[in-house]
Amino acid sequence: MSRMFGTDGVRGIANEELTAEVAYNLGKAGAYVLTEGTHKPKIVVGMDTRISGHMLESALVAGILSMGGEAICLGIVPTPAVAHLTRKYGADAGVVISASHNPVEYNGIKFFDKGGYKLPDELEDRIQSVIENNFEGVPCPTGEDIGEKTIIDDAIKDYIEFAKGTIKGDLKGLRVALDCANGASYKASVETFKDLGAEVYVINNEPNGKNINKDCGSTHMESLRKYVVEKGCDFGLAFDGDADRCLAVDEKGNIVNGDFMMAICAKYMKDHKKLDKNTMVVTVMSNIGLFIAMEREKIDLIKTKVGDRYVLEEMLKEGYKIGGEQSGHIIFLDYNTTGDGLVTALQLSSIIKDSNKKLSELASIMKELPQVLLNAKVTNNMKNIYIEDEEIAGEIKKIEEQMEGKGRVLIRPSGTEPLVRVMLEGENQEEIDKIAHDLVKLIEKKTK
């Protein structure tokens, strides 16, 4: 059987790939593996607003109870709320039913350990192994030993109080627009900003189970851009379906992506002596403009593979405080153990208020260099040709030398398709477009 777990838990089309049976098995195997079968597990369960969430929650919880576990059901809450509340409630694990920014037909199941961290590959593999071995040797409680379900109706209040505590002071005087993606942030983000005194304008906060991420949220920011200008807001903030990421819009309606947000936050943290080792962790997909800006600010950047789990790994290893991705997954380790859209939104808002500057002015800390991303079609066994072929390697080296540190070439094989992705950044869009197309042609010619 192929690996069930992807980079962010188990994901697929609900009721087709991610069936009730799969959810039941994951609940049962997860409850067993995460407590080593030594005691009755206590597992926190949360979900986003998808219509399939209730079906999968019922099955997942049945699996947990069948192992004698206690399922603490929080209802609809952001993914980072599950990470935080798993710790706060002293649970053995947390589970989120969500497919993040994906369309409504998808759903997913993701585990956190008792510390609120995403599971390492080894534990995920053990859960899969228990399922594949048909629960051989796994005890089957009966009678009084079967587990119980607890519902906490106001868990979101605990998360809101935690989030408010991540900034000093209030947000009075700020006029803020929020796009909740008809997702899990529809209560928490609005209540938090109102509690902190901001003047709040909201769109896409009427989830009906079917409209999550539909032309809204951090992956579709057109409506928020218009709304910010129309309402005369100081800035806008867009969450994705499970609210583990956040992107911003300045007062003119321009998108301020994760690279800009990280640059603003890292500089502020450094200026206030809160940036340990003057270092931030980013992925290889961050724009070279961020590297140029941070070098000017004397902030070191550590690069990881794409994926917030790799960013977190590096942060934990060296004790860095901030890291993230261009997509708006930003981790503030002083506050939470995973990307947290609401915490990110609050840090940025607090900086805007404290600095008394417009977001467009703060975002001028960096200049985003033009970028082009193309695919070269190759067979799966030829995905490393760009490393192995001397002519291709020589061409890449020549291009980078010509750019003199004001651009770069990034080539990486697709993990799922017979493609090599060719990304170029540089000062002139036309120039890099031509260079990228020529490089794709060369790679494809060499693989025929």
From Swiss-Prot:
The active site is at S100. Its EC number is 5.4.2.10. GO terms for cellular component: cytosol. The modification Phosphoserine is found at S100. InterPro entries: A-D-PHexomutase_a/b/a-I, A-D-PHexomutase_a/b/a-I/II/III, A-D-PHexomutase_a/b/a-II, A-D-PHexomutase_a/b/a-III, A-D-PHexomutase_C, A-D-PHexomutase_C_sf, A-D-PHexomutase_CS, Alpha-D-phosphohexomutase_SF. Keywords: Isomerase, Magnesium, Metal-binding, Phosphoprotein. One of its GO terms (biological process) is peptidoglycan biosynthetic process. This is Phosphoglucosamine mutase. It comes from Clostridium tetani (strain Massachusetts / E88).
